[in-house]
């Protein structure tokens, strides 16, 4: 068995942008193969899966390398951890609720709840799923948080409450004023969807909502929670010491990143997303609309100071569940996802639906 090396060892790559190939042409299979093998050598990746979408249609899907320490092959039907690509799926799901009049992007979440947020919990439904909202009792700024702020990483929360030194939930800046990556914001919006006013059409299970979308798109091996049918062909990972890391069987749907999927399934979702399937034109446009300027140098570490205005990228904004930008090929959006053993980039171009 080959020696295992680096962090990026299973790259779950959705590349409608086509690896820096010329804008006027799509890469052929041999050209993609050559680029993938170069990238795998450079990153020491043991496995990689790739999809290309053009004009809103899946034009190429393939997989390379191995999926586990037993050298089993990675295939286009291998289940992989989608990580934060879940956030884009959740944003797409929320926009269905917006179209149905159940959620308003710019109305505070407080208006969707039957009682003040800090009065919820502790409760058996909370462990390992939602945040400790009682911690916000002395900070009234929770009342300002809207669904758009949750989807644009501008709630003021840390990425997750449990990485705070005191493991409590805090608001670090006035909501809506800065971009600072936060899975906790997505979890809050999930809470509002699942425990909001039933008279408003909320009180909905996010796992059920996403499963309905996956079923409509023919994504048979994708879900926000683990099911036994995924065991037969699943990808593990490797840490930065080259040690195999078993796939985590996530039991609770979490909008911030619990999705398991395959490259074939995720290609179907990405194609539907760039086409705007199932959404009104206005809601599809909201996803990739510049909602909040990103003024820091990097996404991590969190809570960075703003760059001087002259050094800020003028085109870089948070969209809903994505980051939007303008480049040589026009307006586009991006989402990445990773943990200590996998990495997943998705890059899409609006004009060519690529």
Which residues does each PLM region occupy?
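Bacterial N-terminal signal peptides
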Residues: 9-18
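Short, surface-exposed beta-strand/loop micro-motifs that present aromatic residues
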Residues: 333-334, 342-351
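Short active-site loop at a secondary-structure junction
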Residues: 41-49, 70-123, 130-148, 173-184, ...
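Loop/turn elements at helix/coil->beta-strand transitions in domains of secreted/extracellular proteins
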Residues: 45-48, 55, 147-148, 220-221, ...
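Short, surface-exposed loop or secondary-structure junction motifs
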Residues: 120-340
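Sec/Tat signal peptide C-region and signal peptidase I cleavage site
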Residues: 21-23
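Bacterial N-terminal signal peptides that target proteins for export
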Residues: 1-9
């Amino acid at each position: 068995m080959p020696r295992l090396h680096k962090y990026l060892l299973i790259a779950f790559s959705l590349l409608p942008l086509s690896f820096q190939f010329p804008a006027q042409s799509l890469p052929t299979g041999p050209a993609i193969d050559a680029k993938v093998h170069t990238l795998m050598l450079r990153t020491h990746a043991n496995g990689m899966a790739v999809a290309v979408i053009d004009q809103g249609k899946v034009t190429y899907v393939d997989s390379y390398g191995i999926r586990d320490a037993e050298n089993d092959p990675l295939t286009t039907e291998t289940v992989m951890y989608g990580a934060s690509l879940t956030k884009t799926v959740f944003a797409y799901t929320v926009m269905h609720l917006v179209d149905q009049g159940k959620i308003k992007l710019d109305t505070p979440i407080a208006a969707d709840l039957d009682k003040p947020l800090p009065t919820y919990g502790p409760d058996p439904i909370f462990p390992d799923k939602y945040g400790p909202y009682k911690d916000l009792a002395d900070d009234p700024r929770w009342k300002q948080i809207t669904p758009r702020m949750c989807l644009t990483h501008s709630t003021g929360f840390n990425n997750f409450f449990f990485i705070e030194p005191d493991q409590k939930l805090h608001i670090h800046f006035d909501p809506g004023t800065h971009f600072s990556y936060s899975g906790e914001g997505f979890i809050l919006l999930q809470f509002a969807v699942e425990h909001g006013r039933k008279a408003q059409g909320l009180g909905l299970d996010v796992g059920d909502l996403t499963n309905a979308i996956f079923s409509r798109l023919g994504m048979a091996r994708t879900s926000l929670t683990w099911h036994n049918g995924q065991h037969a062909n699943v990808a593990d990972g490797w840490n930065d010491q080259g040690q195999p890391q078993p796939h985590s069987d996530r039991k609770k749907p979490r909008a911030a990143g619990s999705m398991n999927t395959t490259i074939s399934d995720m290609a179907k979702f990405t194609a539907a997303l760039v086409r705007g399937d199932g959404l009104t034109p206005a809601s599809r446009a909201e996803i990739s609309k510049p909602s909040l300027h990103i003024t820091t140098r990097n996404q991590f570490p969190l809570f960075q100071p703003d760059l001087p205005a002259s050094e800020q990228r003028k085109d870089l904004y948070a969209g809903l569940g994505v980051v939007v930008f303008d480049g040589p090929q026009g307006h586009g959006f991006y989402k990445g996802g990773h943990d200590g053993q996998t990495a997943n980039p998705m890059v899409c171009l609006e004009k060519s639906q690529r």
